[in-house]
Every structure is written in C-alpha cells, then in structure tokens.
C-alpha cells in the first residue's frame, strides 16, 4: 500500500511539474532578477538532452517527462543569489543562470539560460 501511494505521489508530482514547465515562458533578466524568479547559482550546468542530465534526474527520483519541451540547460545544486554583500548567497563560484523551473529544492533546475550577473 505504501509503494502504491509513493507511485501515485511521484506521478502527480511529474504531472504538476510538466504543467508548470509549459506555463512558464521566457527567462529575461531585469536587474538582479529573472522573469522567472531570482538569479540562481548552479554548481554545474548541462545540456537538457545529455546523459548527465538524464542521470541527475533519475538519481533524484524525477522522471524524464519533466524535460518534455524544455530548451536550455539543466542546473545541479542551485541556490538563489541574494543581494550583493549579504550572506553567502551573494557570491557565485558556479554558473549564474535564469531557470524556467527551479522547484526541486535546489537539487535540480531546468530550462536554464546562462547569464553574466556580475556578482
């Protein structure tokens, strides 16, 4: 019974994520924000069609359906960049990006576009 619940929960999560991905369009930046939310700092970025992206999603329990129709990069270990000079989130030692969907608790962000945030 528990395994059935987990399977149903994963299926619903993938369906909701697919809807969110298709609703969000554009990743333009204005100031320190993207049109989709804060600028993110990802420790690693990869092509959404790469074996590394497939492995990252699979390893984190996400189905490949979350990439359906997604253009751009997949980010790994991402966090929002805060205002300059405030906390550890004010600097990025990885790649700064704007992502269409970063609702995976920082583990994965999809539909990312690299930017030069100068932070």
Swiss-Prot record:
Residues 1-26 form the signal peptide. It is found in: Secreted; Secreted, Cell wall. Keywords: Cell wall, Disulfide bond, Secreted, Signal. The keyword Secreted applies. GO terms for molecular function: structural constituent of cell wall. Its main location: secreted. Induction: The highest level of expressionoccurs early in development when the primordium differentiates into densely packed, randomly oriented cap hyphae and loosely packed, vertically oriented stipe hyphae. In mature mushrooms, transcripts accumulate only in the transitional zone between cap and stipe tissue. Self-assembles to form functional amyloid fibrils called rodlets. Self-assembly into fibrillar rodlets occurs spontaneously at hydrophobic:hydrophilic interfaces and the rodlets further associate laterally to form amphipathic monolayers. The production of fibrils decreases at basic pH, while acidic and neutral pH favors the formation of fibrils. This is Class I hydrophobin B. It comes from Agaricus bisporus (White button mushroom).
